[in-house]
């Protein structure tokens, strides 16, 4: 017979108690999460992410998952003998390539995330930006082919899913004025959807610890002006630039805050939303 609580049990109870103000703050909040990278190929990390999404829904948060799929796309193109060409770090997407992109994103990656969430007791539905006219695109750059930038987002289908406690899982595809399919950068798609929903939070999960200052330390809170200055002086560079561009666009168009989150940290989404110190770099307007 057990006669006393273990330290672990006490720590768990204390953590739950400390989370209460954050649970209250985010009740009925909309949180858009960009999920991608190596975690999508790891069963344990996928299951952990799925549990976090189900928990969010159970405590009254409305999560929206937008995913990438670059590594899987590269693998499939290689199997089919289609050579990938990149221009300034962006994939040139011709007609043959966009068909493969759609097949992988909508048919493989999207459904894997949906299944993972459902397996954890949640209810998820997979969509792409082509469904219900969710994302309308214009060409990002004629030289990139079928790579699009969102020109209009109609979030009504997402709001309908919220009413039935369903977690939307969205592949970053859109359609043009003539019905053509466009591949969209996952961060860009997530930002556009967050803006259309006027989301409380946009979380960009990545494989770095956050935005770093000149000394190499993670900056936990920044304003849009801070980000502009750090880009101008070269402190923010390389792959962090497009992520901060997405963040700035989002917070300047109605999203309350965007957080660049270290997705390698277990339960990073929960840590960011429900603890005092979070798990990344928060950017506000």
From Swiss-Prot:
Q: Please provide, in alphabetical order, the Gene Ontology terms of the cellular component aspect for this entry.
A: cytoplasm
Q: Pathway, per Swiss-Prot/TrEMBL?
A: Amino-acid biosynthesis; L-arginine biosynthesis; N(2)-acetyl-L-ornithine from L-glutamate: step 2/4
Q: Does the keyword section mention Amino-acid biosynthesis?
A: yes
Q: Which domain of life is it from?
A: Bacteria
> Which reactions does this protein catalyse?
N-acetyl-L-glutamate + ATP = N-acetyl-L-glutamyl 5-phosphate + ADP
Asked if the record carries the keyword Acyltransferase, the reply is no
Q: What is its main location?
A: cytoplasm
Recorded hits in InterPro entries, A to Z, give:
AceGlu_kinase-like_sf (IPR036393), AcgluKinase_fam (IPR004662), ArgB (IPR037528), Asp/Glu/Uridylate_kinase (IPR001048), Glu/AcGlu_kinase (IPR001057), NAGK-C (IPR041727)
A GO biological process held by the record:
L-arginine biosynthetic process
For this protein, what is the EC number?
2.7.2.8
Record-marked site positions (Transition state stabilizer): 34, 243
Subcellular location field: Cytoplasm
* Pfam families (alphabetical): AA_kinase
| Residues annotated for substrate binding in this entry | 69-70, 91, 183
As recorded in UniProt, coiled-coil segments are: none
A GO MF label: acetylglutamate kinase activity
Q: Which UniProt keywords apply?
A: Amino-acid biosynthesis, Arginine biosynthesis, ATP-binding, Cytoplasm, Kinase, Nucleotide-binding, Transferase
The record describes the protein's role as: Catalyzes the ATP-dependent phosphorylation of N-acetyl-L-glutamate.
Query: What does the sequence similarity comment in the record state about its family?
Result: Belongs to the acetylglutamate kinase family. ArgB subfamily.
Family matches, as NCBIfam families: argB (TIGR00761)
By what name is this protein known? Answer: Acetylglutamate kinase
Q: What is the lineage of its organism?
A: Bacteria, Pseudomonadati, Pseudomonadota, Alphaproteobacteria, Rhodobacterales
């Amino acid at each position: 017979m057990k006669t006393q609580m273990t330290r672990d049990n006490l720590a768990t109870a204390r953590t739950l108690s400390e989370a209460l103000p954050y649970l209250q703050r985010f009740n009925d909040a909309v949180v858009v999460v960009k999920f991608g990278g190596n975690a999508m190929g790891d069963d344990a990390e996928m299951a952990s992410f799925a549990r976090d999404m189900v928990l969010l829904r159970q405590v009254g948060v409305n999560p929206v998952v937008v995913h990438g799929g670059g590594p899987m796309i590269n693998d499939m193109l290689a199997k089919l003998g289609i050579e990938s060409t990149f221009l300034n770090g962006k994939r040139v997407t011709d007609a043959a390539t966009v068909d493969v992109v759609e097949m992988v994103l909508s048919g493989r990656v999207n459904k894997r995330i949906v299944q993972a969430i459902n397996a954890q007791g949640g209810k998820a539905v997979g969509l792409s930006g082509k469904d219900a006219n969710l994302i309308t695109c214009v060409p990002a750059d004629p030289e990139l082919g079928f790579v699009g930038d969102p020109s209009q987002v109609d979030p009504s289908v997402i709001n309908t899913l919220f009413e039935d406690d369903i977690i939307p899982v969205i592949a970053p595809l859109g359609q043009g004025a003539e019905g053509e399919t466009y591949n969209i950068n996952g961060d860009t798609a997530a930002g556009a959807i967050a803006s259309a929903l006027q989301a409380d939070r946009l979380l960009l999960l990545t494989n770095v610890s956050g935005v770093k200052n000149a000394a190499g330390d993670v900056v936990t809170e920044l304003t849009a002006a801070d980000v502009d200055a750090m880009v101008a002086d070269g402190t923010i560079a390389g792959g962090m630039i497009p992520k901060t561009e997405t963040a700035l666009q989002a917070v300047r168009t109605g999203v309350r805050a965007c957080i660049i989150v270290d997705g390698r940290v277990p339960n990073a989404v929960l840590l960011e939303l429900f603890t005092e110190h979070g798990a990344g770099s928060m950017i506000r307007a």
